[in-house]
Amino acid sequence: GHGFRKALKRVWPKAKLQRCTFHAFLQVKRCTTGRPKTIAGIEMYMIAKDLLMIKDMEQAGHWVTRLINWRIKHKTFLSEMTRDEKGKIRPMHERLLKAERSLARLVRQNTLFTYLDESLSYGEELPSTNNRIEGGINAQLRTMLRNHRGMPLKDA
């Protein structure tokens, strides 16, 4: 969240942040489901899924253009309103709007395509996901904690 971003700026002011593209995709999938029913939902899901295939800045630029064009194309659909059970007027396609906003925010913050910045790579390709840490270090920590469930912290 915001706490991490503040801490990163304080400790490493010049560090660049990369949002895991897989987790960005999952955020959209949570909002649209894996089988969206509307055309706008299907297209948003595909845009998010295609995020996982981007290999260079040119592809990233095309992807951002698709995201912007999606918003323009579905503007009328996305502006539809409904009244909830408490009588409050809300966007009818709230979850779809949330999905789009999550991606647009990452684009604005420049945290979606940091892995494509050649000045950071030192000849080695940077990962677009955090699979290495999730499957490596974090998995070992989770296993250790699971095996020692109930162990008092003072003994750890």
Q: For the regions a protein language model found, what residue spans apply to each?
A:
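Conserved beta-strand -> loop -> alpha-helix junction used to position metal-binding or nucleic-acid-contacting
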Residues: 1-2, 6-48
